[in-house]
Amino acid sequence: MPAFDVICRGEKFAHVELQVPGVHNVKNALAAAASAIALHFPAAAVEEGLAAFHGAGRRFEHKGSFHGAEVYDDYAHHPGELQALFSAVKGMGYERIICAFQPHTYTRTKALFSDFVQVLREPDLAILAEIYAARETDTLGISSRDLAEQIPGSRYCATLEEVTALLREIARPGDLILTVGAGDIY
């Protein structure tokens, strides 16, 4: 997990050890530290407060183990958020990164289709659950199957039950399984 020194006016103010991965969390911690400095909090409060933060619900939230693999859930539903998630987990030492992703809304999937295709090539295996409609009906003729057809080695699952069955079949110790999306995949 990230650890770094906070430098203020050219001097070390605090040493921070985060419990959450990713450059985006380092940036958030630096913003929190800057606010604390502006409000005259002591260095110890910054160090202790940031060390005690274990993340927000559905943001790289550890759910347990499944067939020896570690399972984390994340709310990411936009290509930029997916990129941040994949960047955060890449150096964590897992043998394989398996992402079970459920796109959120037909309009977002259609509008960001090529960006989703690009970023979902990053995990070792992308499993595409069907799009979570939310407030929409499919008037665009788009499916997660369309994404899967553009991502080499990916798998399409029409239902969440199919996602679970596939994970049961392929998960093994050393894997990181990410359930990802703003719908009901978690």
What is each model feature region?
Residues 11, 21-24, 31-186:
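ATP-dependent carboxylate-amine ligase
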Residues 1-14:
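Acidic-glycine-rich active-site phosphate/pyrophosphate-binding loop
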